[in-house]
């Protein structure tokens, strides 16, 4: 919403009222940022990156264009760079991403906006992932839409303009960029661990059961071998009224039993994890193996 209001204000608002929109937009972005830890992890999962950190990028970029020099320092903030690179760290291979909460493992291909975000924060890994994904999406037929950019790319005229202005630069970068080296990552704000060893990539979830778009998945793991799924999180069903109702956890995809987690059934009673902040991982420790 903030990016779209700024676009409208920049084109239509009288010059004397523009500072009001700038001030409110800065406040809106601050409110958004307070829900992120310094590590930049998106608790909603990789599929929501395009609707969260990436739209924040456009809002910040617009502020920098409307008020030159005022907001430029934001791009050197570690938290902003961490938010930008989150999507790189969750990427496995091809169309696959580690997924938790209401997130599909097919989280969409990266594109021009991600490239521009990477350029702003000087992230070669993000620029590389975005450029290569975009080049692949343009060159390969894709009947299953595994590589196709997110549908949100098609509903905003400004995104089309960004693409038209930057596409040739993105494609040129894709031809020369070396693949980004995968790395291990621990996100303490949400409790997400990413480990890669040889052919294997592991994702593990600590944290709690009060995330945005929460599933009862504390302790769950996903595993990939040679870029293909081995142990999966099935993600979420098609959204319905029930998904965002008090009956949310009657849906099987939300329940702990469907997240590679144990279920206890003493005396015919079934015990599963419950939603809520108090239902959380305890005594979490990350070994030095991440630095190996």
Task: Give, region by region, the residue ranges found by the protein language model.
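Secondary-structure capping and boundary motifs in well-ordered enzyme cores
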Residues: 1, 21-28, 41-55, 75-83, ...
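Histidine-centered active-site/metal-ligand motif
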Residues: 1, 48-49, 213-218, 259-260
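Active-site lining segments of carbohydrate-active enzymes
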Residues: 1-47, 172-175
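Carbohydrate-active enzyme catalytic cores, enriched for enzymes
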Residues: 12, 53-230, 288-292
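Alpha-helix capping/termination and helix-coil
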Residues: 36, 64-67, 266, 270
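Short helix/strand-bridging catalytic loops that position acidic/His residues to coordinate divalent metals
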Residues: 37-45, 67-72, 210-211, 241, ...
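Active-site rim segments in enzyme catalytic domains, especially the processed small/beta chain
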Residues: 219-284
């Amino acid at each position: 919403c903030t990016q779209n209001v700024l676009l409208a204000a920049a084109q239509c608002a009288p010059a004397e009222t523009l500072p009001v929109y700038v001030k409110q937009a800065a406040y809106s972005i601050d409110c958004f940022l307070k829900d992120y830890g310094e590590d930049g992890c998106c608790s909603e999962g990789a599929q929501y990156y395009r609707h969260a950190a990436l739209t924040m990028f456009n809002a910040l970029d617009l502020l920098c264009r409307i008020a030159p020099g005022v907001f430029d320092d934001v791009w050197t903030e570690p938290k902003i760079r961490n938010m930008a690179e989150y999507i790189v760290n969750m990427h496995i291979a091809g169309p696959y991403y580690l997924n938790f909460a209401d997130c599909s493992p097919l989280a969409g291909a990266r594109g021009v906006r991600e490239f521009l975000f990477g350029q702003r924060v000087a992230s070669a890994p993000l620029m590389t992932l975005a450029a290569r994904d975009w080049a692949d999406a343009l060159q390969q037929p894709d009947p299953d839409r595994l590589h196709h950019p997110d549908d949100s790319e098609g509903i905003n005229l400004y995104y089309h303009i960004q693409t038209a202005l930057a596409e040739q630069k993105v494609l040129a970068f894709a031809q020369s960029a070396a693949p980004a080296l995968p790395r291990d990552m621990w996100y303490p704000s949400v409790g997400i661990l990413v480990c890669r060893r040889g052919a294997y990539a592991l994702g593990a979830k600590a944290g709690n059961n009060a995330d945005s778009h929460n599933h009862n998945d504390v302790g769950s793991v996903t595993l990939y071998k040679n870029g293909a799924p081995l142990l999966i999180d099935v993600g979420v069903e098609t959204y319905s009224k029930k998904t965002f109702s008090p009956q949310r956890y009657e849906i099987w995809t939300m329940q702990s039993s469907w997240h590679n987690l144990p279920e206890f059934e003493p005396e015919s009673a079934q015990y599963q994890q419950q939603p809520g902040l108090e239902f959380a991982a305890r005594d979490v420790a990350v070994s030095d193996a991440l630095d190996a």
